[in-house]
Amino acid sequence: MLEIKLSDVSKIISAKLYGDKNFIIKGISSIEDSKPGYISFIYKNKFRKYLPSCKASAIILAKDNLPFCKQFALVVKDPYIAYVKLVKFMYVKKIPKYRIRSTAIVSKKAILGKNIYIGHNTVIESKVKLENNIIIGSGCFIGENTIIGSNTHLWDNTTIHHGTIIGNNCSIQSGSVIGSDGFGYANKNGSWIKIPHLGKVVIGNNVEIGSSTTIDRGSIDNTVIGNGVIIDNQCQIAHNVIIGENTAIAGGVVMAGSLIIGSNCIIGGASVINGHIIICDRVKITGMSMVMRSIKTPGIYSSGVPAQLNKKWKKNTALIMNINKIKKQIKEILKKYKKK
């Protein structure tokens, strides 16, 4: 972590500074748990209530919150983006010294670029191609004929199966498995016959994948993750799924096979999406939704029942279970009314 003058902070985040330009900032704290000597930020007006009790020495905020700020202030158009810029500058990522650790097993037929770190107990199989500036943590497995682009980081205990293609500037967190066989079986006389999966997983540039996420290889064609996609922890992406550029997928999402999702979509946590359907660009699906049919129009889509008092939930569920009976009763009442 770097210590930095407020004048330098204002330059980094393109802010107008109100306060002592020579004041030294020691770090970044949240507005709720602020500390003297630290800088905090407000990106929504609902956090304005914390300003009177805030102990931070400086605040990043929008112009409309400036009258409520008694601390040194840095006014920007978008406080959240400004905060991200500052974090990236102040908290420098520690890069291990480039080397291959003694317990790593690297095939002689693997092709390694410049500045490669390979951690303990990692296995790199034949004909793997690693570009430049790659970090591979301990306990990883990279199957044969895999290609990994420059500036990509595989965290500890990541598994990349054969033939996978990963682009530049990607990050795959611990426990994730890329390129397993998909859930493909044929039923013959009541018995299941496994279908070999011949496709690959192809991941674009600037993709981030969280921990314990699984992405299956395609059955014939490839499973494709577009440029700039971000995927949270514990997501299941089945065979032949195609995800468009800059789509964000929150934790616990389950996607069935041959689903196509457009670009710039947001999929809320724990949503379940049917296979063999198409979701167009710029769709937002709220958390815990179940999507059964294609979505052809951009917008916000929801399903499911939010939590409520148990008594109320039981009554509402009883009404839903009896909806057809209630419908018939209403029809009978309307018939009698019309006769009058």
From Swiss-Prot:
Keyword Metal-binding on entry: no
Gene Ontology CC annotation, any one: membrane
Class in the EC hierarchy, top level: transferase
Any GO molecular function: N-acyltransferase activity
EC nos: 2.3.1.191
Pathway membership, UniProt: Glycolipid biosynthesis; lipid IV(A) biosynthesis; lipid IV(A) from (3R)-3-hydroxytetradecanoyl-[acyl-carrier-protein] and UDP-N-acetyl-alpha-D-glucosamine: step 3/6
UniProt KW Transcription regulation keyword: no
Top-level division of the source organism's lineage: Bacteria
Keywords: Acyltransferase, Lipid A biosynthesis, Lipid biosynthesis, Lipid metabolism, Repeat, Transferase
PROSITE patterns, alphabetized: HEXAPEP_TRANSFERASES (PS00101)
Active site, per annotation: 239 (proton acceptor)
UniProt-listed GO biological process terms: lipid A biosynthetic process
Subunit and partners: Homotrimer.
Family: Belongs to the transferase hexapeptide repeat family. LpxD subfamily.
Record protein name field: UDP-3-O-(3-hydroxymyristoyl)glucosamine N-acyltransferase
Organism, scientific name: Wigglesworthia glossinidia brevipalpis
